[in-house]
């Protein structure tokens, strides 16, 4: 009698945390490249998510992103991370020009009981692809950043989380009267990530 083996795509808490934290690393690189925060020649092209992606070769930024993704993975696995915000600011004035907001919903049953979920890697990759394509085309819906900029990353965690000394308390770095663009989301069935970018509305200032 013929038998058939059916493979299931099992997503564990640790696996989901790895997917989401890796996504944040690639998304941060893509934002810094596409928004011109760092020069084009300081990035190299790699293939990820079935797409050409850009990674910084700036040692300071590489180290920052590596430490960031490691910490995010730890918080995601503990179910303690609520939101990550990449903030782009004017280098001269520190005025906040853009906020790339990634809000995270965590399946608490998985964290508490250690159960797993099912979703195919291909489906998750397709959802991430859609977000990465939107970041890559951000020049079509965001105003040009025509001044030198710097960036920072804010993490919103549960109050009881242990925070490393390398992280400091911060104000939310909000934008007054921002314009907002909602991007796609992805869901590992354990961590759901919604993406929203808000930016300074110069037209409002001129009225």
Mark where each language-model region is.
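Long protein-protein interaction modules used by eukaryotic assembly/scaffold proteins
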Residues: 1-57, 62, 71-207
């Amino acid at each position: 009698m013929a038998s058939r083996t059916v493979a299931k795509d099992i997503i564990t808490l640790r696996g989901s945390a790895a997917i989401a934290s890796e996504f944040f690393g690639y998304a941060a690189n893509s934002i810094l490249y596409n928004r011109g925060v760092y020069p084009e020649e300081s990035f190299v092209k790699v293939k990820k998510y079935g797409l050409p992606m850009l990674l910084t070769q700036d040692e300071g930024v590489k180290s920052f992103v590596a430490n960031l993704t490691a910490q995010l993975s730890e918080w995601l696995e503990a179910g303690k991370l609520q939101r990550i915000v990449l903030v782009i600011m004017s280098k001269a004035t520190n005025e906040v020009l853009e906020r790339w907001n990634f809000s995270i919903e965590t399946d608490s049953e998985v964290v508490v009981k250690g159960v797993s979920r099912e979703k195919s890697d291909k489906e998750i990759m397709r959802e991430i692809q859609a977000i990465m394509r939107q970041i890559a085309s951000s020049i079509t819906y965001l105003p040009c950043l025509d001044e030198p900029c710097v960036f920072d990353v804010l993490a919103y965690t549960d109050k009881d989380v242990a925070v490393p000394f390398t992280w400091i308390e911060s104000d939310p770095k909000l934008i007054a009267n921002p314009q907002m663009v909602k991007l796609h989301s992805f869901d590992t069935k354990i961590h759901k990530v919604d993406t929203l970018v808000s930016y300074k509305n110069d037209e409002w200032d001129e009225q």
